[in-house]
Amino acid sequence: MSDVRNVIIIGSGPAGYTAALYTARASLKPLVFEGAVTAGGALMNTTEVENFPGFQDGIMGPELMDNMRAQAERFGAELIPDDVVAVDLSGEIKTVTDTAGTVHRAKAVIVTTGSQHRKLGLPNEDALSGRGVSWCATCDGFFFKDQDIAVIGGGDTAMEEATFLSRFAKSVTIVHRRDTLRASKAMQERAFADPKISFVWDSEVAEVQGDQKLAGLKLRNVKTGELSDLPVTGLFIAIGHDPRTELFKGQLDLDPEGYLKVDAPSTRTNLTGVFGAGDVVDHTYRQAITAAGTGCSAAVDAEPFLAALSDEDKAEPEKTAV
């Protein structure tokens, strides 16, 4: 079992690395569990990022994360590319167990485990990620200028993605497995009014086609079983997100969608000394810049909490021998 640290950060990405930077600069010596596979977060799977302030010519997602990581490390953050398999956040001293079974202890924990896009679950889906398949229109839409694109989904996110993509695309086809949309009336009307957007109803994706890049989709009508081909070079999947909160169920309060609940505008959770930031608490914006902002907030919230603990320790009278 390790010595008690000031703060452990579970997760990386813009939120985790920003929290690490701020706590490190406050001389709190944070320990960061970046994740064995997901170190760097969702931006590790993107290409050029053009909407993060400070990079007028854009920056590749992995490079941005490497820069953030190096900056946090420069100020003394300890970064471990490992996963956390168990936590106990109930006591004054929190415990975090890594994949080797080592138990790490800390006075405060910042949760930045993020969320993951729901996938179609098709064999070629991951292989063509970044090669025509995407889960983020605002991240990748510009790269599909004058191309035929498909958007999968029927909710507000799918309509937002389709409307945004229509600025660049030659055409946008929304594929939905029902004959009505779940999106709000305003979002539906906006999509229906867009001359570049068309709909394929009662259908699902049966196959993502292509070798080195996306070549098209094979669709299946869910009522008749009939198969059809949809020739597109861009596929945007917008069927929702799943927050990575499985580890915290039964300890931290979650909202009905599974996202971590915080006492906004702060980042405090229902447990003293535990803070949440980034996409794990955000099912509205899900942008790198907003994640970084809440990572900063979590660090700033943790600092006075830890300072108060330190003051309490100093105030305790020394025990005299009898």
From Swiss-Prot:
Subcellular location: Cytoplasm
One example of a Gene Ontology biological process annotation: removal of superoxide radicals
Pfam families assigned to the protein according to its UniProt record, in alphabetical order: Pyr_redox_2 (PF07992)
Record-given protein name: Thioredoxin reductase
Chain sites annotated for binding NADP(+): H176, R182, I239, Y259, R286
Originating organism: Streptomyces coelicolor (strain ATCC BAA-471 / A3(2) / M145)
Factors inducing expression: Expressed from 2 promoters, 1 of which (trxBp1) is under control of SigR, and further transiently induced (about 50-fold) by the thiol-oxidizing agent diamide. Part of the trxB-trxA operon.
Entry EC number(s): 1.8.1.9
Disulfide bond positions: C136-C139
CC cofactor note: Binds 1 FAD per subunit.
GO molecular function annotation: thioredoxin-disulfide reductase (NADPH) activity
